[in-house]
């Protein structure tokens, strides 16, 4: 029988939490109720879902999807996020599941793929968090006390879709990667 349990696939022996079951049920309901998303959602599933507090009373739902299903999710990202936010009343962010591999030991002939380095994983998570906006610039500012603040400039074309979520983006990224990030839109220079 086809149920909402098929929409969440976790590691062997790990049971989904109650919150993850509700997210999987929302996916299942969207697939059965929404005709325009039905064919796109048919083969898609999620790995995990976490709920986190954002500035103020708002909450965010971070949904981890398998890395190889990243492209199909991005194809329907805007519609899917709109529907899930309407149902839940929370900000929804999709992030691909990535794995960091420790650097190889001295003298080891094993090569570590670039996609498995800490830097590449954190950059990938950053791109996933701000999607559908694109990152057009990045500045790192070091404060006098040694703290590091990263300024991310987003594409102004997607301002209408993403401006209300900027605090959510920075809170989610801080929770996932432990780095302080400020999101801005570059000021257009008029000649």
Swiss-Prot record:
Keywords: Ribonucleoprotein, Ribosomal protein. GO terms for molecular function: structural constituent of ribosome. The keyword Heme does not apply. GO terms for cellular component: 90S preribosome; cytosolic small ribosomal subunit; small-subunit processome. Pfam families: Ribosomal_S7e (PF01251). The keyword Acyltransferase does not apply. InterPro entries: Ribosomal_eS7. One of its GO terms (biological process) is rRNA processing. Transmembrane segments: none annotated. Signal peptide: none annotated. Belongs to the eukaryotic ribosomal protein eS7 family. This is Small ribosomal subunit protein eS7. It comes from Hordeum vulgare (Barley). The gene is RPS7.
């Amino acid at each position: 029988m086809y149920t909402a349990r098929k929409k969440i696939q976790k590691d062997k022996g790990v049971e989904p939490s109650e919150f993850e079951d509700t997210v999987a049920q929302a996916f299942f309901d969207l697939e059965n109720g929404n005709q325009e998303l039905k064919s796109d959602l048919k083969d898609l599933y999620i790995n995990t879902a976490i709920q986190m507090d954002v500035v103020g009373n708002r909450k965010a739902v971070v949904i981890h999807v398998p890395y190889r299903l990243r492209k199909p999710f991005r194809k329907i990202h805007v519609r899917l996020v709109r529907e899930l936010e309407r149902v839940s009343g929370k900000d929804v962010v999709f992030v691909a599941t990535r794995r960091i591999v420790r650097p190889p030991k001295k003298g080891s002939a094993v090569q570590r793929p670039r996609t498995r380095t800490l830097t590449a994983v954190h950059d990938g998570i950053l791109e996933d968090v701000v999607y559908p906006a694109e990152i057009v610039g990045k500045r790192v500012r070091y404060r006098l006390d040694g703290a590091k603040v990263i300024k991310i400039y987003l594409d102004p074309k997607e301002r209408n879709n993403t401006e209300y979520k900027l605090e959510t983006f920075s809170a989610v990224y801080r929770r996932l990667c432990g780095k302080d990030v400020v999101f801005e839109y570059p000021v257009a220079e008029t000649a």
